[in-house]
């Protein structure tokens, strides 16, 4: 089992090769998966640690080779998926909806499963910023993928609510693309132009330990309650041509969900071990057991993004329900 924590340079070299070679056909028994940074990917950490894909593959008489990669940002993820450099990628709900929208009738990208519902906090070290209306052109908001990622799209939804639909991009110009670990360090240090960060677990909790950092907004405020943060998604080609591998992967996710819920302290240890995290175990346990967080494969409130982003003109295609952009294996659950 291979695990590569790719730098962006390596990532884009790989993408360039992908464009030259075209999409790669993969036989049953192989799957390449990419995740981003943070405890939002704990289900995948458990899958990897327990070798659950391999386990469920063997149950179907299949020896599956799993290739793990780590990339920051939805843009790089989506490019890697469409070039065939990766089979399965992970990102927030809005980036998944964007690629679903753009590939309808072509690669037909859809979501596989949720990776859990958890809040994302908009944080700042600027004492003058209490609400969204307090941000000025002098502020800089760090996000993993400016304008297009989960955090940016969530900010756009709230901006549209506060300032009107025609102003939904109001804060795009002061948004800066930066991986969560770097943005967290910058916010805590308080010595760079970055004075705000639309963060995610565990980074937001780490930042809030600093007395100079406070919360402005939660994604749960925007969406009206618990909502899916990250999802896994793939192309129709991979889904249809690799039914056993796909099913083994889906079954592995479901088992990982159960493992986490059965023993959350052990899951916290898994996160630290697999991610090689330097966070204190007590902090990770606090996050994993937070009642706001639910590690579930069932999608929650994803349709709010689909509906609003279509209304704003970001999505050309209108989904009738969440099932339009999830593969059928997820349809048995009471999602939204």
Task: Give a label for each model feature.
Residues 1-12:
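Bacterial N-terminal signal peptides that target proteins for export
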Residues 10-20:
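Bacterial N-terminal signal peptides
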Residues 21-27:
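Sec/Tat signal peptide C-region and signal peptidase I cleavage site
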Residues 29-168, 173-177, 191, 195, ...:
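Short, glycine-/small- and polar/acidic-enriched structural segments
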Residues 54-61, 221-224, 291-299:
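Short, solvent-exposed loop/beta-turn-alpha elements that line the ligand-binding surface or hinge
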Residues 169-176, 181-272:
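Pocket-lining segment of extracytoplasmic ligand-binding domains
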Residues 240-316:
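Secondary-structure end/capping motifs
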Residues 309-336:
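Conserved C-terminal helix/tail region of periplasmic/extracytoplasmic solute-binding proteins
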């Amino acid at each position: 089992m291979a695990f590569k924590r790719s730098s962006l340079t390596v990532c884009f070299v790989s993408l360039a090769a992908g464009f030259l070679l075209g999409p790669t056909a993969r036989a049953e028994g192989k799957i390449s998966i990419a995740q981003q940074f943070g405890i939002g990917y704990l289900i995948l950490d458990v899958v990897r640690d327990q070798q659950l894909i391999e386990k469920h593959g063997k149950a179907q008489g299949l020896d599956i080779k799993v290739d793990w990669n780590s990339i920051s940002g939805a843009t790089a993820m989506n490019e890697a998926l469409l070039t065939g450099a990766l089979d399965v990628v992970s990102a927030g709900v809005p980036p998944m909806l964007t690629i679903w929208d753009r590939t309808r009738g072509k690669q037909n990208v859809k979501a596989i499963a949720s990776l859990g519902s958890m809040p994302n906090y908009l944080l700042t070290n600027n004492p003058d910023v209490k609400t969204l209306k307090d941000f000025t052109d002098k502020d800089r908001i760090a996000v993993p993928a400016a304008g297009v990622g989960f955090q940016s799209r969530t900010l756009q939804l709230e901006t549209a609510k506060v300032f009107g639909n025609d102003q939904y991009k109001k804060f795009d110009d002061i948004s800066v693309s930066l991986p969560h670990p770097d943005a967290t360090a910058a916010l805590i240090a308080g010595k760079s132009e970055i004075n705000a960060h639309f963060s995610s677990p565990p980074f937001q909790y780490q930042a809030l330990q600093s007395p100079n950092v406070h919360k402005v907004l939660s994604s749960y405020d925007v969406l009206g309650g618990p909502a899916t943060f990250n999802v896994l998604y793939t192309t129709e080609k991979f889904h249809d041509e690799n039914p056993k591998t796909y099913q083994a992967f889906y079954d592995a996710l479901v088992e990982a969900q159960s493992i986490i819920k059965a023993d959350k302290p052990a899951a916290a240890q898994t996160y630290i071990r697999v991610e090689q995290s330097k966070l204190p175990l007590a902090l990770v346990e606090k996050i994993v057991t937070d009642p706001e967080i639910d590690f579930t494969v069932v999608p929650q409130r994803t349709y709010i993004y689909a509906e609003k982003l279509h209304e704003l003109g970001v999505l050309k295609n209108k989904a009738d329900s969440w099932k339009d952009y999830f593969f059928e294996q997820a349809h048995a659950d009471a999602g939204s």
